[in-house]
Amino acid sequence: MSFSRRQFLQASGIALCAGAIPLRANAAGQQQPLPVPPLLESRRGQPLFMTLQRAHWSFTQGTRAPVWGVNGRYLGPTIRVWKGDDVKLIYSNRLAENVSMTVAGLLVPGPLMGGPARMMSPNADWAPVLPIRQSAATLWYHANTPNRTAQQVYNGLAGMWLVEDDISKTLPIPNHYGVDDFPVIIQDKRLDNFGTPEYSEPGSGGFVGDTLLVNGAQSPYVEVSRGWVRLRLLNASNSRRYQLQMSDGRALHVISGDQGFLPAPVSVKQLSLAPGERREILVDMTNGDEVSITCGEAASIVDRIRGFFEPSSILVSTLVLTLRPTGLLPLVTDNLPMRLLPTEIMSGAPVRSRDISLGDDPGINGQLWDVNRIDITAQQGTWERWTVRADMPQSFHIEGVSFLIRNVNGAMPFPEDRGWKDTVWVDGQVELLVYYGQPSWPHFPFYFNSQTLEMADRGSIGQMLVNPAS
């Protein structure tokens, strides 16, 4: 669509009276408190109830938009479980269409991962009992309904899932949820002039919006004590990757990736966060200065005006979160720990190598997803070497496994990427060492898929059978 002189003059008129109407281009200058999802914990064998339903949410001040969510709110509660627990979930689908749910990064057998075989029709329930046997990590739950994942996650069926263990409990790092330990769920959307999310599937690639949201809020701030603050970052966007940095150039101290703690903290000035990827960072607020996390350059005024007339992929604001220190004493006063975990040595050698190709068109290795086809058969307790290539840069995820990144386009991975992972950004070629720790079965296979949700919906999914160890 061309941007004519008439449209520019119309837009100029709109801009003059922007203060009178709630336009998205005006939202970047307004800050609101960070919404912190309620904490839902497993206690003494009691089930965790998760109701999938319609709700309303305010993305812009003074408006309430129809959305989907869990337990009556946009997105869902933060779930916290402990290693060694057997957690009973009760999903209840109160929406008018079929939904399946999964916990991405959870290491459980295939029948407990969700997917087509665990589809919930309207008013149906699913009640898995999940054995939590993995180390502390930040995971996330979300819809993974075939051909509908992108729309359903965009609508609000997602949330954070925390696994804790004895190590995470005793490390001298912030662990008071909502006080010095915060979930930060990053998404991009496109809002109409009344603050209602708009979604239209792109002709190719994945959806990219122009409005940045954190926990469902634009340009949020949070008041913190003067000390260490822990932020659990999740990219829950459909396809957008973020490059995060601090507004004053101070370091981000990365302590954890998808599958748990790094051996030691890694200090970086810029941090990549791919769709589906999770990272935990510590920020030092001792000096008492307000600081923000940002993700690049915001749209210019011309780009904003253009956005009134055609969909835009340029973010109106790139402000992720502002940290405002208060006079409160810090709960954690220790120095940054030198070590978080002992260095693990990989035992055993890869038993085989595989090539995985993600093209511009939907499909993996030239084949669209087929619920009746198993693409990979492996053995529980073994390692394999996967070489994953992508013509179009995209995020890639494997269910039911942990992997280490061996190299990225022939070079060593960055230090912050040298821990256990389940999601990786592929721009060219990455080589992974994949460990099969959980079994799956033909009717309950694990997925490996593009984490560009629209590409997955169009068929960029493979199915994996992991035979149980004898």
From Swiss-Prot:
Assigned GO CC terms: cell division site; outer membrane-bounded periplasmic space
Signal peptide: 1-27
Domain Plastocyanin-like: 222-287
Chief location of this protein within or outside the cell: periplasm
Pfam families: Cu-oxidase_2, Cu-oxidase_3
MF terms in GO: copper ion binding; oxidoreductase activity
Subcellular location: Periplasm
The record's account of how the chain is modified after translation: Predicted to be exported by the Tat system. The position of the signal peptide cleavage has not been experimentally proven.
Highest taxon, organism lineage: Bacteria
Keyword Signal set for record: yes
Swiss-Prot/TrEMBL keywords: Cell cycle, Cell division, Periplasm, Signal
Gene Ontology process terms (BP): FtsZ-dependent cytokinesis
Entry-linked InterPro entries: Cu-oxidase-like_N, Cu-oxidase_C, Cu-oxidase_fam, Cupredoxin, FtsP, TAT_signal, TAT_signal_bac_arc
Function comment: Cell division protein that is required for growth during stress conditions. May be involved in protecting or stabilizing the divisomal assembly under conditions of stress.
Family the UniProt entry places it in: Belongs to the FtsP family.
Name of the protein: Cell division protein FtsP
